[in-house]
Amino acid sequence: MAKKVEKVVKLQIPAGKANPAPPVGPALGQAGVNIMGFCKEFNARTQEDAGLIIPVEISVYEDRSFTFITKTPPAPVLLKKAAGVEKGSGEPNKTKVATVTKDQVREIANQKMQDLNAADEEAAMRIIEGTARSMGITVQ
């Protein structure tokens, strides 16, 4: 018989840098999870993505055991990395902060494809282009 999921905790944590301090500690402590066990496992699984923020979905079971799924980094994080900027524009329609190429957008779309609600690569690219526009990043 399958274990019953008691709680699902969603967090965004920098890759390889999970520690018991907030926000990880309080969120998992309330669910009764072994915080250090999660931190060690998460850091081991995400060490090659250092510097990126990784969304994680932690399923906590009745017996206080847990499993977690790491997702792809958020599109804005990948776009900022590709464009080489710290943050998006405060006024995206007036002030453009950077430019990315169609090839960079295609690469990001392919990386995010499993998490996007898109039927094909073109639809995924349009989603990423829309995110870029809302950040003040021009797509060429």
UniProtKB/Swiss-Prot annotation:
One or more lysine residues are methylated. Keywords: Methylation, Ribonucleoprotein, Ribosomal protein, RNA-binding, rRNA-binding. One of its GO terms (molecular function) is large ribosomal subunit rRNA binding. GO terms for biological process: translation. GO terms for cellular component: cytosolic large ribosomal subunit. InterPro entries: Ribosomal_uL11 (IPR000911), Ribosomal_uL11_bac-typ (IPR006519), Ribosomal_uL11_C (IPR020783), Ribosomal_uL11_C_sf (IPR036769), Ribosomal_uL11_N (IPR020784), Ribosomal_uL11_N_sf (IPR036796). It holds the Pfam family Ribosomal_L11. SMART domains: RL11 (SM00649). It comes from the Bacteria. HAMAP family: Ribosomal_uL11. Belongs to the universal ribosomal protein uL11 family. PANTHER family: 60S RIBOSOMAL PROTEIN L12, LARGE RIBOSOMAL SUBUNIT PROTEIN UL11M. Forms part of the ribosomal stalk which helps the ribosome interact with GTP-bound translation factors. Part of the ribosomal stalk of the 50S ribosomal subunit. Interacts with L10 and the large rRNA to form the base of the stalk. L10 forms an elongated spine to which L12 dimers bind in a sequential fashion forming a multimeric L10(L12)X complex. This is Large ribosomal subunit protein uL11.
